[in-house]
């Protein structure tokens, strides 16, 4: 997302190793569920009383465990006032950068419980502690978007937690701009498109049913876009430009064997693979809007929160790049945005009542005021969006 001039500067790369998760699904901290160990204490004077009080205690514990699933609007019997429960928001890639900043902004508002969907459980736990997140305001769950099995397991684990889903934020991304040869996901897809687009596509399709069931006043599905995939901007015209072509590479499975590892079927380019994946993200958001907004009332949106020049997305670049890129964005392009500010902007798209319009690509001006931005022809092509959707369905096993 913060890639306005990334393609013009030298860099090196390496593929990060997958984090290993040691937490058991039975660990109460994984789902934010309170322990039952103290709930059955009592001094009973008769067997009948013992049974009665035991039933009362167990009922109370069940109510506490299922607290997140209570109706969105609760009415106080004493005062007759309506109060909103906390909303539940899943954020992918919430252990660093924009994802962590957004988690912090939402958790500190007191209105949201954040589900941090991350590849590395321990990294996420340390990040949450470092950010000062109160334990009652977040839950960490394992998700590796480079594995479709992991995506399905995450959805299964989330549903077992019995938490409702009110907002889904597809934020996580990988970026290997200097890669000369493609790397691949567990399912054999080129890693940038496989992670940034296909992993999120499957996650969104599966969790759509959970969003539909939400009784929250404003349920939303948000996909983080990028200015580099929007070719009607200066940054979007920095070579190599995003271009999905006729999707022959995507239709072939992006395997690099019988088909190209690039969506357009061309020669591999790591920077272009990332940009193409962000075009897919923005096309997918619009196709979700066309297919489901009127039926479900869900708000589907994308955004570019600004150039986060210090983000970990550039962690594989050489030290010189990491040193020069932030001041270049601050003083030359004037597009620099801190992680904290970008997190507030994404949190705004999550909860601001004025940003409920569906099918919109949000951006911000220099005064940090949000506005509806225009997408390029490539990123707003309805027919291409339909084709990307249909091919993606086949690749992830939904068709």
Curated annotation (Swiss-Prot):
Gene3D superfamilies: NAD(P)-binding Rossmann-like Domain (3.40.50.720)
Chief location: plastid
GO cellular component, one term: chloroplast
Catalyzed chemical reaction(s): chlorophyllide a + NADP(+) = protochlorophyllide a + NADPH + H(+)
Protein name, per record: Protochlorophyllide reductase, chloroplastic
Class in the EC hierarchy, top level: oxidoreductase
One Gene Ontology molecular-function label: protochlorophyllide reductase activity
Function: Phototransformation of protochlorophyllide (Pchlide) to chlorophyllide (Chlide).
Residue stretch of the organelle transit peptide: 1-64
GO biological process terms, semicolon-separated: chlorophyll biosynthetic process; photosynthesis
Family in the record: Belongs to the short-chain dehydrogenases/reductases (SDR) family. POR subfamily.
Pathway assigned to this chain's UniProt record: Porphyrin-containing compound metabolism; chlorophyll biosynthesis
Compartmental location: Plastid, Chloroplast
EC number of this enzyme: 1.3.1.33
Keyword terms of this UniProt record: Chlorophyll biosynthesis, Chloroplast, NADP, Oxidoreductase, Photosynthesis, Plastid, Transit peptide
């Amino acid at each position: 997302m913060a890639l306005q001039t990334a393609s013009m500067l030298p860099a090196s790369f390496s593929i990060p190793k997958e984090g290993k998760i040691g937490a058991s699904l039975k660990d109460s901290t994984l789902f934010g569920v309170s322990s039952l160990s103290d709930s059955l204490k009592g001094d009973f004077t008769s067997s009948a009383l013992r049974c009665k009080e035991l039933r009362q205690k167990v009922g109370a514990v069940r109510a506490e465990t299922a607290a997140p699933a209570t109706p969105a609007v609760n009415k106080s019997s004493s005062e007759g006032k309506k109060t909103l429960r906390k909303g539940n928001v899943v954020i992918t890639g919430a252990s660093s950068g924009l994802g962590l900043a957004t988690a912090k902004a939402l958790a500190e508002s007191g209105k949201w419980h954040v589900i941090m969907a991350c590849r590395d459980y321990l990294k996420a736990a340390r990040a949450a502690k470092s950010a000062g997140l109160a334990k009652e305001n977040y839950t960490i769950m394992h998700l590796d978007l480079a594995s479709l099995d992991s995506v399905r397991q995450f959805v299964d684990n989330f549903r077992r937690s019995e938490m409702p889903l009110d907002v889904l934020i597809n934020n996580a991304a990988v970026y290997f701009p200097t890669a000369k040869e493609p790397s691949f996901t567990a399912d054999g897809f080129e890693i940038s498109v496989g992670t940034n687009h296909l992993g999120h596509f499957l996650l969104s399709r599966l969790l759509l049913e959970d969003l539909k069931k939400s009784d929250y006043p404003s349920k939303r599905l948000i996909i983080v876009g990028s200015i580099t995939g929007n070719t009607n901007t200066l940054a979007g015209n920095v070579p190599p430009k995003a271009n999905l072509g006729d999707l022959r590479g995507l239709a072939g499975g992006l395997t690099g064997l019988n088909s190209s590892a690039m969506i357009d079927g061309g020669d591999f380019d790591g920077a272009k693979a990332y940009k193409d994946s962000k075009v897919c993200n923005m096309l997918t958001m619009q196709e979700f809007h066309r297919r489901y907004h009127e039926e479900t009332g869900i708000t589907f949106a994308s955004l570019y929160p600004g150039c986060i020049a210090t983000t970990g997305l550039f962690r594989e670049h050489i030290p010189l790049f990491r040193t020069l890129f932030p001041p270049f964005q601050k003083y030359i392009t004037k597009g620099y945005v801190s992680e904290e500010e970008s997190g507030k902007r994404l949190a705004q798209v999550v909860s601001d009542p004025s940003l409920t319009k569906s099918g919109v690509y949000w951006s911000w001006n220099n005064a940090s005021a949000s506005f509806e931005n225009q997408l390029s022809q490539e990123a707003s092509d309805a027919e291409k969006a339909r084709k990307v959707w249909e091919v993606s369905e086949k690749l992830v096993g939904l068709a």
